Every structure is written in structure tokens, then in C-alpha cells.
Regions:
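Conserved, structured C-terminal
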Residues: 1-189
């Protein structure tokens, strides 16, 4: 059995297939054979990263970790603390909201022409380190170098930032919306 979910991690109309691991080779071969007439091709993790960066999709292990709260990660729209019988961790999240957060995620367009932020680069404001890049890459559809970073909360709203990439500080502009298909028209096609 295969469960097909109309969701994906790349911001295009697509499907995730959930199945027993023992079926993967047969399923892959069947889909690849059927897709030949549509010019199906394989693509790898750099392509997936490029696509997810353009949609500002956060990644597990980079933007989303056990040490980062949903509030710090900018995931507020995905939970409701007013519901009865709320989720595990709701009380801790409520406490975090009430006490305030020290860091917040920012989505950045980086002014660079030959190298992109990948993760762990320092983020500067007024020549002081104020955060760290969690991931980044080049958006091939938008022709933009993009990155996520956690910075001090007070700098998360439009401040001028810089990212050190290969020993050079590069300007980074905080984006307030997704750079590719911000209204999710492709996903709703």
C-alpha cells in the first residue's frame, strides 16, 4: 500500500508518497517508467534546497530543532494555544511567549554573486555578531541568494544585516514575504 499526500517540500504542485521501505525500489522504478513519456528526471538535495529556500520552508535540523521554539521559528500560524486539550508542550510554549524570546528567525536575500550562505555563517549588525545563518542557497527560479538566520529579536524587523561569506561581509536584506509564489497559487493548481 502507498499513501499519496498532496503536500511537498518544494513549493510546487506535487505529492509525497508514504510506503513501506521494502517497496521503494519497485515504486521508484514504476513511477520512473511511467514518467518517461513526460520527460521525468531525477534531482537531488541541492535542487530541493533551492526550491524550499524560495518558498521559505524551514528545514528540520537547521531552522527547526529541539532547542528552538515555534515562536522563535516564526511558526505561530501553525498552533492555537486557546484550544482545549492542546498539544504536548503547549504550556512551555505559552511560558516562552509570556517571557519573550531572545532570538527570532529571519528570511534573507543576500547580496552576493559568487557564493551563497550555507549555514553557520555569522550575521552582523553594526559590526557586531548578532546571529547565525541556519541554511541558505541560490534560488534558481528567482535568481536570488537566500538564507535563514536566527538573530536577536530586536533586529528581526527590517534592520540592515550582513553575513560573512568566505571572509567577506555581504549585505543581507530581511524579506517580509516569500520570494516565489507567495500566494501559493502553484500548490492550489
Amino acid at each position: 500500500p502507498v499513501r499519496a499526500l498532496r503536500v511537498n517540500y518544494v513549493g510546487e504542485l506535487g505529492w509525497e508518497l508514504h510506503h513501506p521501505m521494502g517497496q521503494m525500489e519497485l515504486l521508484y522504478d514504476s513511477i520512473y517508467e511511467a514518467g518517461k513519456k513526460e520527460n521525468i528526471i531525477n534531482f537531488g538535495t541541492y535542487a530541493v534546497n533551492s526550491l524550499r529556500m524560495e518558498k521559505a520552508y524551514r528545514g528540520w535540523g537547521a531552522e527547526l530543532t529541539g532547542e528552538i521554539s515555534l515562536v522563535e521559528a516564526g511558526m505561530d500560524r501553525f498552533f492555537n494555544l486557546k484550544k482545549k486539550n492542546n498539544f504536548f508542550g503547549a504550556k512551555a510554549l505559552q511560558n516562552k511567549i509570556q517571557s519573550g524570546v531572545d532570538i527570532k528567525i529571519v528570511y534573507l536575500e543576500v547580496d552576493v554573486d559568487n557564493a551563497d550562505a550555507r549555514g553557520n555563517e555569522p550575521v552582523y549588525h553594526n559590526n557586531k555578531i548578532v546571529g547565525v545563518v541556519t541554511s541558505g542557497g541560490y534560488g534558481f527560479r528567482t535568481k536570488k541568494s537566500l538564507a535563514f538566520a536566527y538573530v536577536k529579536s530586536e533586529l528581526a524587523n527590517g534592520e540592515s544585516l550582513e553575513i560573512e561569506i568566505q571572509g567577506q561581509k555581504r549585505k543581507a536584506k530581511i524579506l517580509d514575504k516569500v520570494v516565489y509564489d507567495p500566494d501559493n497559487q502553484k500548490l492550489r493548481a
